Amino acid sequence: MATYAIGDVQGCYDELQGLLRRFSYDKSSDRLWFVGDLVNRGPKSLEVLRFVRDLGERAVVVLGNHDLHLVAQHEGFERPHAGDTFIDVLDAADARELVAWLRTRPMTHAEGSFAMVHAGLLPQWSIAKAVELGREVEQALAGPGYRDFLKNMYGSKPERWDDALAGWDRLRVVVNAMTRMRFCDREGRMDLEGKGTQPRKGYLRWYETRPQDQIGRASCRERVCNDV
C-alpha cells in the first residue's frame, strides 16, 4: 500500500487520471492525499469532485481557497469571478450533495510524521495547535450555522494571530493562513497581497519562519505538505 500526496488538481480531471496511471495507482489499496483546491481553473471540476468523493476513505482532502470559494458561491455569499470554471458543479443535479461533502472536509490532516495543509501555518502554531485550530473552522463549516460562517469568512483582517482572538476574527485568521497565505514575518503577520514567488521586504516564505524539523527535511520528525 502506498500513499501519494497530490497538489492542486483545480478541475484538471484528465491530467489527474494521467498522473495516477503514471505511478500505477491501485485504487484497491493505495491512498491519495489531496492538498486542497480540487476545483476551478481547469475544465472538469465536476468530474474531479465526483471521482475524489467516490474514493471514500481511500482519499484525504484538505480545503483550499478555491474549494471554499465554490462553497460560498453555491450558498450565495460570493459572486462569480471572471476566471471561475466550476459552473458545471453549480449546475449539476448533485450539486448540493457534492458541496455538502466538500464543506465537511478538514482544514488540516496529520498522520504519523506528516501533516498536510493547503497554504501554510503561522510560526506561533505547532502542528498539534494547527490541527486544533483547524477543527474550530471545520466545526463552523459543518455545523448548522455554516451559512453565518461563510458570510463572515472573507477579509484580510486581522493580519496576525493572537491567542485572545475570538469569534469570526479568530476563524478568519485560521482560514487565511491555511488557505491563502504565502508569506508572513517571524511574528506571524501575514502578507495576503503578495501573489508571486518572492516575498516583499519584511516578509519571508511562511515555511522559512518555522523550525527546521517541520518543513520537509529528510531527517525531520514532523513534515508539512502544502501546495508550494
Residue ranges and their predicted role:
Residues 2, 98, 112-115, 174, ...:
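A generic secondary-structure signal marking the coil-to-beta-strand transition
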Residues 33, 101, 125, 205-206, ...:
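Tryptophan-centered motif/residue detector
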Residues 104-109, 138-219:
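His/acidic metal-ligating clusters that form di-metal
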Residues 7, 36, 63-64, 117, ...:
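Single, functionally critical "micro-switch" positions that shape active/binding sites
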Residues 46-48, 54-169:
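Active-site neighborhood of divalent metal-dependent phosphoester bond hydrolases
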Residues 218, 222-228:
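Single conserved hydrophobic/aromatic residue that forms the stacking wall/gate
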Residues 1-55, 68:
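N-terminal active-site segment of His-dependent metallophosphoesterases
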